[in-house]
Amino acid sequence: MSLNIITEKDKKQSYNLNKLQKRLRRNVGNAIADFNMIENGDKVMVCLSGGKDSYTLLDILLNLRLNAPIHFDIVAVNLDQKQPGFPEHILPEYLKSISVDYKIVAENTYGIVKEKIPEGKTTCSLCSRLRRGILYRTATELGATKIALGHHRDDMLETLFLNMFYGGKLKSMPPKLISDDGKQIVIRPLAYCKEKDIEKYAVAKQFPIIPCNLCGSQPNLQRQVVKEMLQKWDRQYPGRIETMFSAIQNIVPSHLCDSNLFDFKRIRHGKIPEGIEGDIAFDKEAFSPTPLVQENDEKIDFIQGEMISFKEVN
């Protein structure tokens, strides 16, 4: 009898994992298609830190590649920053076990940061700049045409509010960007993925997670405050996070105040400029009492034979 109970439990866990994987595949596949992130012949350099996000990114991209209508290569890259206590064996062992091409780049950025930044001050800004330069250089050396990072939907929303609260800008993380010199394209295939889905997936897949606090840097208190605010909203108002993310995909420049995005000086009597959305000067806007955007876990887009296919991009 106990064996039957275990079997039923295993079946349920397997079903839940399969459902979760399909959702992540769908979200990643849609993001890749919507923003033309990966093209035929690309070599995608997946930046692997050893955290849940980058493990999930690599796993889902490998899964998608099996049935993708285009050919692209994947190489995993980890930057060993020589932090004390960093378990150097974990990532090579894992990557060998799944037969993925990889490169470990050893650079003592930890030592540079400790030398330049006074004790007790946050090291994240300098560390980030150093990492970016090394990863761009590595991408060039490997012939990579795309650099894939593991930022997800929650990261993008947190960044939006951080920029509004502390930077006075309406700015988030772009799903796709080009480096200042025009030589590197960075993509974020997890842009449509929820952090809690990634957390569940990482636990279910038993990825060998490496702690992210080895550098001893001060926590980003501003980001933590924003994260907790969004989590509270998500608990109190189901669907609000989805609606907010939808909002950053539906920008109406004529109803904001940035003259760089919309030329308000063109507005004259008798002529309606292109890009203006409706005359609502004296209207009281009506909103639905519940969020308009509700995620449907059962909706499967771009599926062929249980595997995601990319949209055709002109």
UniProtKB/Swiss-Prot annotation:
The keyword Cell inner membrane is assigned to this record: no
Record field: catalytic activity: cytidine(32) in tRNA + S-sulfanyl-L-cysteinyl-[cysteine desulfurase] + AH2 + ATP = 2-thiocytidine(32) in tRNA + L-cysteinyl-[cysteine desulfurase] + A + AMP + diphosphate + H(+)
UniProt cross-references to Pfam families, sorted A to Z: ATP_bind_3 (PF01171)
InterPro entries from the UniProt entry: Rossmann-like_a/b/a_fold (IPR014729), TilS/TtcA_N (IPR011063), tRNA_Cyd_32_2_STrfase (IPR012089), tRNA_thiolation_TtcA_Ctu1 (IPR035107)
Superkingdom of the source species: Bacteria
Cell location: Cytoplasm
GO MF annotation list: 4 iron, 4 sulfur cluster binding; ATP binding; magnesium ion binding; sulfurtransferase activity; tRNA binding
Short sequence motif named PP-loop motif, residue ranges: 49-54
Listed cofactors: Mg(2+); [4Fe-4S] cluster
Residues that, per the record, bind [4Fe-4S] cluster: C124, C127, C215
Additional facts recorded: The thiolation reaction likely consists of two steps: a first activation step by ATP to form an adenylated intermediate of the target base of tRNA, and a second nucleophilic substitution step of the sulfur (S) atom supplied by the hydrosulfide attached to the Fe-S cluster.
PANTHER family with a match to the protein in the record: AMINOTRAN_5 DOMAIN-CONTAINING PROTEIN, SULFURTRANSFERASE-RELATED
Function: Catalyzes the ATP-dependent 2-thiolation of cytidine in position 32 of tRNA, to form 2-thiocytidine (s(2)C32). The sulfur atoms are provided by the cysteine/cysteine desulfurase (IscS) system.
Quaternary structure, from the entry: Homodimer.
Family: Belongs to the TtcA family.
Protein name: tRNA-cytidine(32) 2-sulfurtransferase
Organism: Histophilus somni (strain 2336)
